[in-house]
Amino acid sequence: MNIVIGYNDQFNYIFNNLKNDTLNNSILISGNKGIGKYFFVTNLIKEYLIYSTNNKNIKHHLSLLKNNTHSNIKVLKKEIDLKTNKIKNFITIDQVRNINFFSRETSQIANLAKFIIIDSADNLNSNAANSLLKILEEPKKNTYFFLISHQPSLLLPSIKSRCLKINLPTHNFSDFSEILISNNITDDETIKFLFD
């Protein structure tokens, strides 16, 4: 199993509950910005796809996941404002309404769960947050919301109360070194500099 360095326990807990159909429909993944929360979630979904498809057409599924085009996975993040050509300050209510439709649709792939990744839930404006709350109050079976948050204190308490909370701590030096070495950064001085 492809486990994210430093977060094996959290990964295994979520994955085992997912494959046993005992996972809460809403999962809040929190931790400092830049520690790999999105990477954690996408690797979790990757392992789920491998497990649930018994490796049938897995290259196709993984290619779709990598390109953000998988029909069972939606990523919600700040969009580009077409008028200004700049990234919007918030995730809007219209974006949340679109994922509501997605969450209610029947899966295009039989027996395969659907995933909605909100990166980052901290960027929901108040109308979007309230709309998301209504969706989370009536979860659809086999649809999972992963809310990524750098500052959970910014989220509505009522949203947080509906989520399984998983905190990913900042990596210790050993895990940090392992990540860099796995990415072919092996110079000790560089590793120490980047860690500090």
Language model segments and positions:
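Hydrophobic residues in beta-strands of the RecA-like P-loop NTPase core, especially within AAA+ ATPase
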Residues: I29, I118, L132-L133, S149
